[in-house]
A protein has these predicted regions:
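C-terminal lobe and pocket-closing loops
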Residues: 123, 209-277, 309, 321-323
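Bacterial N-terminal signal peptides that target proteins for export
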Residues: 1-12, 20
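An extracytoplasmic/periplasmic, membrane-proximal ligand-sensing/linker region
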Residues: 29-31, 173-174, 214, 239-240, ...
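A ligand-binding cleft/hinge motif common to bilobed small-molecule-binding domains
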Residues: 96-106, 170-174, 201-235, 312
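Hinge/capping helix and adjacent helix->loop/strand transition within the periplasmic-binding protein
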Residues: 82-88, 102-189, 201, 238-240, ...
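N-terminal (or domain-start) structured segment
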Residues: 23-113, 152, 176-203, 212, ...
Length: 323
């Protein structure tokens, strides 16, 4: 390679680096859309709206949420994958993302490459909730009823193939009980069905139900995790309640289209970290019985890979057929 060519490539690399830095410094220069691939009212929607408000306050630029639900979140995430990779369209999701390869034979995007994990935050236990005046006062009573007769005890979710669906199935297997699944169009709709007495229980991430719990309308029988949630010291874990089922701690996270400048992603990660360190976001997380942590992209990617394997094992032990 001639000296002239070396100088050219060096200058090109320097220019690219300078442009990337400039993008990070000027981003966001216009409103940022965050696609929530589920209906309003669920955990992802609740947490994402709070994060969007925090990012808007920090940057002085508009961050707005667009609900684009359908097909277990794939419609909304496909829209994000097809968006311009400029940092102005992001996608929000939870551990359901790791389920997608196990519930669909073919996805409308490349699950492993078309979307880049940015950061995860607000870590929430999965909780088994019943109506406040439900006849089941303990998890043991619910399990006993489930063992007594197949399909007599019902549970609702935001749809077949969602995290609560698989979490409920895994719980039933661990408990040796039979429960009938009733799918709804979104977690919020399932919660309304629970409140009206149409179903017996619901598996939900705590952000989506704590409002009703605090209002005395719903009651928690158990939470996932190896220890009790700090904000719910009176609620036992599943193991403490007699079922050897640890479950998973859920999260809310953001993804960006493949090709989004690294400098923009790094800026977004920093803004998210600043938001989660604020007293307001910490109080918000604790108020919905969650932990106010934050993961960088590397930790997030590693966890997603582990969850994908975990959900694959759960799917293999259920009667669910890939769509």
């Amino acid at each position: 390679m001639t000296l002239r060519l070396r100088s050219f490539f060096a200058a090109a690399a320097l220019t690219a680096c300078t442009l990337a830095q400039a993008q990070a410094q000027t981003w966001p220069a216009k409103p940022v859309k965050i696609v929530v691939p589920y209906p309003p009212g669920g955990a992802v929607d609740v947490v994402t709206r709070k994060m969007a408000a925090a990012l808007q306050a920090q940057t002085g630029q508009s961050f707005f949420v667009e609900n684009k639900a359908g097909a277990t979140g794939t419609i909304g995430m496909a829209a994000v994958a097809q968006a311009a990779p400029d940092g102005y369209t992001l996608g929000a999701n939870d551990t359901t993302w790791a389920l997608l390869p196990h519930i669909f034979r073919k996805l409308p995007f490349d699950h492993a490459h078309d979307l880049v994990p940015v950061s995860a935050y607000v870590f929430a236990p999965m909780a088994l909730v019943v109506k406040a005046d439900a006849k089941y006062r303990t998890l043991g009573e619910l399990v006993t009823a489930g063992k007594a007769g197949a399909d007599k005890v019902t549970y609702g979710t935001g749809g077949a193939g969602t995290t609560p669906h698989f979490a409920s199935e895994a719980f039933g297997i661990a408990a040796g009980a039979n429960f009938m699944h009733v799918p709804y169009k979104g977690a919020g709709e399932a919660t309304m069905a629970l409140l009206s007495g149409q179903i017996d229980f619901q598996f939900a991430s705590t952000p989506g139900v704590m409002g009703q719990v605090k209002g005395g309308k719903l009651r928690l029988l158990a939470v996932s995790g190896s220890r009790r949630a700090a904000a719910l010291p009176e609620v036992p874990t599943f193991a403490e309640a007699g079922v050897k089922y640890a479950g998973l701690i859920n999260f809310t996270g953001l993804w960006a289209p493949k090709g989004t400048p690294a400098a923009v992603i790094e800026r977004l990660q920093k803004e998210i970290a600043v938001a989660m360190a604020s007293p307001e976001m910490k109080a918000f997380a604790e108020g919905i019985a969650s932990e106010p942590g934050v993961w960088d992209a590397a930790t997030f990617s590693r966890d997603l890979a582990e969850r994908t394997v975990f959900w694959g094992k759960v799917a293999a032990n259920t009667a669910f057929e890939r769509q």
